[in-house]
Amino acid sequence: MSRSIKKGFFVDYHLLEKIEKANKAGAKKPIQTWSRRSTITPDFVGHTFSVHNGKAFIAVYVTENMVGHKLGEFALTRIFKAHGGMTRKEI
C-alpha cells in the first residue's frame, strides 16, 4: 500500500536544510546522509548524495528519472556473489 497523497512525501528535515544550503551556495559537493528513507524531490536533481548502505557510503547522482523514489533504492545493502556450482578449480 502506498502513502496517501494528502500526507505528501517524506524527507528528513536535516536533509532539506542541507539541500537548501547547497542550492543557495551553488555548491555541488556530495551531501553525506544516512537517511535512506527520504523521498527524492525535484530540488535534489543535479546533486550527488553519499548514501550509507550500512557499511560504506555509496555515491548517488540524482537525475529527473529518480524523482519520487527513495534514496535507499540506489544504494544496495546486499551483494550477490553466486550460487554454488562448478568453479574453475573443479574443471
From Swiss-Prot:
The keyword Cytoplasm does not apply. One of its GO terms (biological process) is ribosomal small subunit assembly. Gene3D superfamilies: 30s Ribosomal Protein S19, Chain A. Pfam families: Ribosomal_S19. The keyword Ribonucleoprotein applies. InterPro entries: Ribosomal_uS19, Ribosomal_uS19_bac-type, Ribosomal_uS19_CS, Ribosomal_uS19_SF. One of its GO terms (cellular component) is small ribosomal subunit. GO terms for molecular function: rRNA binding; structural constituent of ribosome. Keywords: Ribonucleoprotein, Ribosomal protein, RNA-binding, rRNA-binding. Belongs to the universal ribosomal protein uS19 family. Protein S19 forms a complex with S13 that binds strongly to the 16S ribosomal RNA. PANTHER family: RIBOSOMAL PROTEIN S19P FAMILY MEMBER, SMALL RIBOSOMAL SUBUNIT PROTEIN US19M. This is Small ribosomal subunit protein uS19. It comes from Opitutus terrae (strain DSM 11246 / JCM 15787 / PB90-1). The gene is rpsS.
